[in-house]
Amino acid sequence: METLDKIKKQISENPILIYMKGSPKLPSCGFPARASEALMHCKVPFGYVDILQHPDIRAELPTYANWPTFPQLWVEGELIGGCDIILEMYQAGELQTLLAEVAAKHA
């Protein structure tokens, strides 16, 4: 499967998906740690892809997403943004609302 097809499949199969370095429980550095912590505090199921284990996705996704950095949060096929946006939305209460609605819809 081509890398771009793999990315599209992951995004379509996971209503809430974060591309990050490491895993939510073992992030590789501060940005994915803060982003995944915010997601875990929302108490909804989400998927993740460790881009360190998938160098092809790490190379291709920034072009596909038109977003150069990681982590990247995707919700229902749309890029929400990276760490700063995730944290801003969380602090404003917007992330919790969005993710709860999406999780309920896909339960």
UniProtKB/Swiss-Prot annotation:
Similarity remark: Belongs to the glutaredoxin family. Monothiol subfamily.
InterPro entries to which the protein is assigned, alphabetical: Glutaredoxin (IPR002109), GRX_PICOT-like (IPR033658), Monothiol_GRX (IPR014434), Monothiol_GRX-rel (IPR004480), Thioredoxin-like_sf (IPR036249)
Chief subcellular location: cytoplasm
This protein's UniProt keywords: 2Fe-2S, Cytoplasm, Iron, Iron-sulfur, Metal-binding, Redox-active center
Organism listed in the record: Haemophilus influenzae (strain ATCC 51907 / DSM 11121 / KW20 / Rd)
Gene from which the chain derives: grxD
Places the protein is found: Cytoplasm
Residue sites binding glutathione per the record: K21, R58, F70, C83, D84
Function as written in the Swiss-Prot or TrEMBL entry: Monothiol glutaredoxin involved in the biogenesis of iron-sulfur clusters.
Gene Ontology cellular-component terms listed: cytoplasm
Annotated protein name in UniProt: Glutaredoxin 4
NCBIfam families given in the database record: Grx4 family monothiol glutaredoxin (TIGR00365)
SUPFAM superfamilies linked: Thioredoxin-like
Segments forming domain Glutaredoxin: 4-106
